[in-house]
Amino acid sequence: MTHTTLFTSESVSEGHPDKVADQISDAVLDALIGQDPNCRVACEAVVKSGMVFVAGEITTNAWADVEQITRNTVLQIGYNDPHLGFDGETCAVVTAIGKQSPDIVMGVDGREDQELGAGDQGLMFGYASRETNVFMPAPITYAHRLVRQQALLRKNGRLPWLRPDAKSQVTLRYENGKPVAADCIVLSTQHSPEISQESLREAVIDEIIKPIMPPHWLDKHTRFLVNPTGRFVIGGPVGDCGLTGRKIIVDTYGGMARHGGGCFSGKDPSKVDRSGAYAARYVAKNIVAGGLADRCEIQVSYAIGVAEPTSISVETFGTGKIDEVRIQQLIKEHFDLRPGKIIEELNLLRSIYKATATYGHFGREEPEFTWERTDKAEILREAAGLAAANVTN
């Protein structure tokens, strides 16, 4: 008997207000960590109409022109015209930046790297599955690809009436746990006022949706909802206030896996909200790539100032090829999840973070996304006593 379900995930473009804020936060981090790998950064941004407010706690020997970094980021996204209501050249940039609390410093700094204490308490999740060639859930993967395609066509001038703000939403039909068809695809994009709804709908379906979605998933039952309100001229920070860290499900697994609640952007890797989540993805992906399970969710937790995780747990949703207790043992044998060792193994003290602030932190194939490597898949497979796995990444 076929068991049919639907699952939906969404993504947002680089011009979405919350993503503008994320990119500013990570651009500041990149500027500092490139000069001072041991900097401590917790940088937040708020964007609205003609203003950007950058605040947080930063302790570093480096210097960064936060105002200019902010302006450059806004301009690179595409807010470069006063007629859009938000322009990187003319917007106000206000900063309120202090130093990291000395109470936190004493638990995090001044230790050997391998004993670096976690920058805060918290729990993080990592997930991987065989739904796609990047070991990610299919709905979030294609939602990201749709808004990336929107940005590409906007920037290369093929659809010159596109504007930076956009959202996508993909609902897939699953049969016995596998995606088989697209039930509904939503694409809302900001646009210039002169384009008609009819022309916009046709172009979005033909130029954005169909080139990205697998053709065998699109059938007569697939619903296309393009700018469902009929008009999306006012957008970006004019239409909505943007805030760093408000798109944590977009940043991760699109709701297919659990989330510990901590955001990533603007945080240096001593913050386990970021490095712990990256490490958990690394572990989960290698477990699936190694053939130990078809789906895997890892939870890891930390206490502030303590290097060793307070817990590590594994869930394979009935797809495990070996017992979950054994998988947990293999994790402890082959992965060092102390923050200092995570930072070292994944080479996180680099200016790599602005690229993560759009289109998801996971399932990416760029080389700087070191937590996407599957270099331990074969080691895990052999340790588990399994036949060769099909490792595609």
Curated annotation (Swiss-Prot):
Annotated positions binding K(+): 44
GO cellular component, one term: cytosol
Binding site for L-methionine: 57, 100, 240, 271
Enzyme Commission numbers on file: 2.5.1.6
Presence of the UniProt keyword Transit peptide in the record: no
One Pfam assignment: S-AdoMet_synt_N
Compartments it resides in: Cytoplasm
GO BP terms: one-carbon metabolic process; S-adenosylmethionine biosynthetic process
Cofactor dependence: Mg(2+); K(+)
Reactions accelerated catalytically: L-methionine + ATP + H2O = S-adenosyl-L-methionine + phosphate + diphosphate
Region annotation (Flexible loop) ranges: 100-110
CDD domains for this protein: S-AdoMet_synt
Description of how the protein assembles with itself and partners: Homotetramer; dimer of dimers.
Family note: Belongs to the AdoMet synthase family.
The protein's name: S-adenosylmethionine synthase
Source species of the chain: Coxiella burnetii (strain RSA 493 / Nine Mile phase I)
